Amino acid sequence: MKRFFLFLVVACLYVVTNAQVLVPTTWTAYGLTFEAPKGILIEEDTEDTFLLNSSRFYISVHSLESDDMKKEDLEDLLKGLADDDGVQKQSDIVTIDLEQFHGLYLKGIAEEDPCYYVCLMTKDAGSVFYVSIIYNRTDDKVVEKMLKSFKMEEE
């Protein structure tokens, strides 16, 4: 019985220490805000690129030319970006509908790490963003929370 309780305590501590706290993070150039792991380092915050890095996650966000782009173009764009980056074992493309964005994502393997590749288009078709999230553990639920948190700051 003591072993069972010891196991239970150790299991609870493992879950608590591995829980990932997410905090709002903003790409200042566009006012694009999303939940990112607490303590992640911002490596670049420019007009073109927003890069974040930690021991568990590498997040890259890019603004894309959106002239004449339609919602229907996102699937080919996403597939092309993932192919260009050599993403292996690509999943089917999944549609996500956020309050301010039309979006698509696919999961795959970038080199040896699991990844999500995402395209987001503002519903007014004014901006298109490409996001890649590479992580070193199969922590899909955390990444899915991040994906669902994307929003533009109100002006």
Enumerate the predicted regions with their spans.
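Short, hydrophobic/aromatic-rich segments at coil-to-beta transitions
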Residues: 21-26, 48-49, 97-107
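Surface-exposed amphipathic alpha-helical segments
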Residues: 20, 31-34, 38-41, 82, ...
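Sec-dependent N-terminal signal peptides
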Residues: 4-19
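Signature of long, low-cysteine stretches enriched in small and polar/charged residues
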Residues: 38, 78-125
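Short, surface-exposed coil-to-beta transition loops
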Residues: 45-47, 112-119, 130, 142-145
